[in-house]
Design a protein with these regions (language model features):
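Amphipathic, Lys/Arg-enriched alpha-helical "gate/interface" segment within cytosolic domains
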Residues: 2-50, 60-64, 69-73, 77-110, ...
């Protein structure tokens, strides 16, 4: 896991630690000192800690004009013990929502497990974003993780989508593709 870096090909467009509106503004990173772990496995030092002991993230892009953010996740999403959705909502998503972001693309291909609890925070997040015309999409969640996510019926609140070649898109084009697909599903 220490070799899995956050996607960095958009860093010429956006760097979360340099964005004064980002929850991660001012953070500094080491390229050589591995200190964060998911269980006993070290992860690359570029990932951001947001309060969970098993799930980390990197904000790849926040576009305040178009009102969307792309966030990559790594680790285990554990609502049963860690209440990760509460931490993610309170410590990251709400801070972006306060800045006007209403649409979130969560890249979940490195979320290896999911353990559910109740759906309260998912429902709350869905309601808050829907009121503003927003949404949350989990992109490329592994099938075993999707199984547990769907079993808890959380896909009512967070859309699950597949787009294997998302890295080939520019951020705005990725957003427009996903936004267009969601709009088409609703009509």
């Amino acid at each position: 896991m220490q070799d899995i870096e956050p996607f960095y090909n958009w860093r010429h467009i956006y760097i979360s630690e340099e964005d004064q509106r980002s929850p991660f503004f001012g953070r500094t990173y080491s390229e050589f000192e591995f200190s964060q772990t998911v269980y006993n496995y070290y992860i690359h030092p570029q990932w951001d800690d947001f309060g969970s002991r098993t799930l980390y993230l990197k904000t790849l892009l926040a576009d305040y004009d178009e009102k969307y953010a792309v966030i990559e996740l790594i680790g285990e999403w554990n609502d049963a013990i860690e209440n990760d959705i509460m931490e993610l909502k309170r410590e990251v998503l709400e801070k972006f929502m306060y800045e006007g972001i209403t649409k979130f693309i969560l890249i979940a291909e490195n979320v290896l497990n999911f353990h559910s609890s109740n759906s309260d925070y998912y429902e709350e997040l869905y309601d808050e974003l829907s009121d503003e015309g927003g949404w949350v999409v989990c992109l490329n969640m592994p099938s075993q993780t999707q199984y547990d996510f769907k079993k808890a019926h959380l896909n009512r609140y967070i859309e699950l989508m597949e787009l294997d070649n998302w890295r080939t898109y520019k951020p705005f084009h990725l957003f427009k593709k996903i936004d267009g697909e969601l709009t088409a599903r609703l009509h």
